[in-house]
Amino acid sequence: MMGQNQTSISDFLLLGLPIQPEQQNLCYALFLAMYLTTLLGNLLIIVLIRLDSHLHTPMYLFLSNLSFSDLCFSSVTIPKLLQNMQNQDPSIPYADCLTQMHFFLLFGDLESFLLVAMAYDRYVAICFPLHYTAIMSPMLCLSVVALSWVLTTFHAMLHTLLMARLCFCADNVIPHFFCDMSALLKLACSDTRVNEWVIFIMGGLIVVIPFLLILGSYARIVSSILKVPSFKGICKALSTCGSHLSVVSLFYGTVIGLYLCPSANSSTLKDTVMAMMYTVVTPMLNPFIYSLRNRDMKGALERVICKRKNPFLL
């Protein structure tokens, strides 16, 4: 109520992507295909983990939550982008804009925490294989997931409430394809220093520290594997960490660059491209990087298909 009492505008205008009119249809088809790939890939992972008891392990508990987070993360922004591209109506109500920002932060933060949990799970599995079951107990894993949801909900609500207290005057044009927090702060006509300090401090806790923990976990994994100096060991280290670290670097690199270390001469096009990387590309790649190409998931898919063909097959 506070935000609505102080603001003199009822909606914002999302400029969307800087593309030419003749490219609209092609871009619409491309983003629709990427969004459907994200939905189907992540839904398949969730269903397989739910149906196959062989996948009821800590790693796949984290993976199922990551897939749900990716699915929701993309669904917060991409449907509105597709709607605007199709209808040529860039407006979004004030309340809807804050709601979109809230859930964007929630699921983005949740992904950050889950990536840390997955890195720690791999660290324990490779460096302490004999103690894996004792360390990664069901209670610990469920507690980590529950705590991640609580912390991300609190963080998203904090930023939403701080944004709602700001005044927005004449300028309501957001040069972005979603209600980005930094873009909204630039439109505010009241003091935003508190918001900026909270972004910097909480961003360090939510983004930078998890990123460093992930790098530390994978560094220990590589160090542990390379203690056996063999070509096979090196290949195993690279296959274990290389693809995972590429997605982690893509996600955290763009987030840190956009929100914690913004460039003074940063252009709207550059910011939009960087945002597309972690809102569209990363959620689409995660199912392929983390799950769909490994033997456990392929085996689970085969077992589920066989059970559907022969219900009496155990």
Swiss-Prot record:
The lineage of its organism: Eukaryota, Metazoa, Chordata, Craniata, Vertebrata. Disulfide bonds join C97-C189. Odorant receptor. It is a multi-pass membrane protein. It comes from the Eukaryota. The chain crosses the membrane at residues 26-49, 58-79, 101-120, 140-158, 197-219, 237-260, 273-292. One of its GO terms (molecular function) is olfactory receptor activity. Belongs to the G-protein coupled receptor 1 family. It is found in: Cell membrane. The keyword Transmembrane applies. GO terms for biological process: signal transduction. CDD domains: 7tmA_OR1E-like. This is Olfactory receptor 1E2. GO terms for cellular component: plasma membrane. Residues 1-25, 80-100, 159-196, 261-272 are extracellular. It comes from Pan troglodytes. Glycans are attached at N5, N265. Keywords: Cell membrane, Disulfide bond, G-protein coupled receptor, Glycoprotein, Membrane, Olfaction, Receptor, Sensory transduction, Transducer, Transmembrane, Transmembrane helix. Residues 50-57, 121-139, 220-236, 293-314 are cytoplasmic. Its main location: membrane.
